[in-house]
Amino acid sequence: MPSKDAAIVNKLGLHARASAKLTQVAGRFQSNVWLSRNDRRVNAKSIMGVMMLAAGKGTTVLVEAEGPDAEAALAAILQLIADKFGEGE
């Protein structure tokens, strides 16, 4: 199962709009996608789960994917995070 740590770099962290974008991207893939922070692991396709991580700017999350398109799912989520969820800040 591919996985990688990613730092949340956008100004507002995983707020509602960023969480919605992340769940939309995760939902495009057949694979299961999870985000973990500290001891909490959530389904990246669940907006409530993603928001419950309370991941602010500078927080590191572990992104994991398992399934037929796991590598592509992981790459897409990591790219979204690196692009600051399209927010520019």
Regions found by a protein language model. Name each.
Residues 9-57, 82, 88:
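Compact, glycine-rich, soluble single-domain proteins
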Residues 1-10:
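Short amphipathic
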Residues 56-89:
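C-terminal structural segments of small proteins and small subunits
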Residues 4, 33, 59-61:
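Conserved beta-strand core positions
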